[in-house]
Amino acid sequence: MSHRKFSAPRHGHMGFTPKKRSRTYRGRIKAFPKDDKSKPIHLTAFLGYKAGMTHIVRDVDKPGSKVNKKEVVEAVTIVETPPMVIAGVTGYVDTPQGPRALTTIWAEHLSEEARRRFYSNWAKSKKKAFTKYAKKWQDEDGKKLIEADFAKLKKYCSSIRVIAHTQMKILRRRQKKAHLVEIQVNGGTIEQKVDWAREHLEKQVQVDTVFAQDEMIDTIGVTRGHGFKGVTSRWHTKKLPRKTHKGLRKVACIGAWHPSRVAFTVARAGQKGFHHRTIINNKIYRIGKSALTEEGKNNGSTEFDLTQKTITPMGGFPRYGIVNQDYIMLRGAVLGPKKRLITLRKSLITQTKRVAHEKINLKWIDTSSKTGHGRFQTTAEKRAFMGKLKRDFLAEAEAKA
């Protein structure tokens, strides 16, 4: 910064270093919301799959704002959240080194998609996972051990978590291996939490029992990967003048002669994207039911738009397909590409801003094709506008013949 009368802040935030690839593509929950015994028992997280984006029209409810009671168009992200199955329960004990797992109790019956997670090659394996453990539930001595473990959880543990897995068989994805996650149980006493977890073993949990409409939540996941990138793309450093020797998209000075090494604070080329990130304060605009049920067959309609349609746009979401299961509509963008596993977690902070408490009333949801400039909202609307096509006349001719 020699010979300058002003300062130039560094380019790029050091709070996210090192910028390296995430170890896994599933968002890891490193902290859970603070427990409150006065509240009813509930789970604090859920897993979903990013389907794509669309836009909505709604009325703003902000007294005193210039856009109060006016229509606004906002981008939203659809995250498909099929029901999860609780496969086990584990308890944690507080120690000077932090929480430590005391014991884990698994359900008697684990689905094949959950057991696949414990093998790198399911086809060549003996498929013996949990076969010996399942006999505990049938043997008298084994039942005594399980009862002792449940009693141990109630006596010593300070926090209870359930082990839940997704259901890939109802997602219509190529992957058969389920995703497992530990979810902390909040509310009530330790004894009530253990009893609740035991009652829900091998049972499904819906997303609407975890989150609510208009709630602010956190999304945890791995961002879209971009591979090896240069310093200008990776750190957004200023390009050098046109006549610079040996390249413009570089850092002119990477440090002094001594110390004779490059400091870690100097912007360098390397990996960009596929980083583990947590995005806080994503507002839930809607929790939709499965399109395969009677309640959710028109889960893309609103009180103002009575058109019978689902949330899936015409032609499906690009690079994802059809959303048939329960879904969550979040305001704005969500990290990661299509099909990326997204961890949804209850907010860690107490929401005090007016935006967090605003009631959302959707007036219209766009379901036009996302592969171009969509003109029609439903196939029926397109058919009514276009009239009979050549294939329709040919089909009628074949039927008469």
Curated annotation (Swiss-Prot):
InterPro entries: L3_arc_euk (IPR045077), Ribosomal_L3_dom_3_arc_sf (IPR044892), Ribosomal_uL3 (IPR000597), Ribosomal_uL3_CS (IPR019926), Transl_B-barrel_sf (IPR009000). It is found in: Cytoplasm. It comes from Caenorhabditis elegans. GO terms for biological process: translation. PROSITE patterns: RIBOSOMAL_L3 (PS00474). This is Large ribosomal subunit protein uL3. The keyword Ribosomal protein applies. PANTHER family: 60S RIBOSOMAL PROTEIN L3-RELATED (PTHR11363), LARGE RIBOSOMAL SUBUNIT PROTEIN UL3 (PTHR11363:SF5). Pfam families: Ribosomal_L3. One of its GO terms (cellular component) is cytosolic large ribosomal subunit. The L3 protein is a component of the large subunit of cytoplasmic ribosomes. One of its GO terms (molecular function) is RNA binding. Its main location: cytoplasm. Residues 1-22 are annotated as: Disordered. Belongs to the universal ribosomal protein uL3 family. Keywords: Cytoplasm, Ribonucleoprotein, Ribosomal protein.
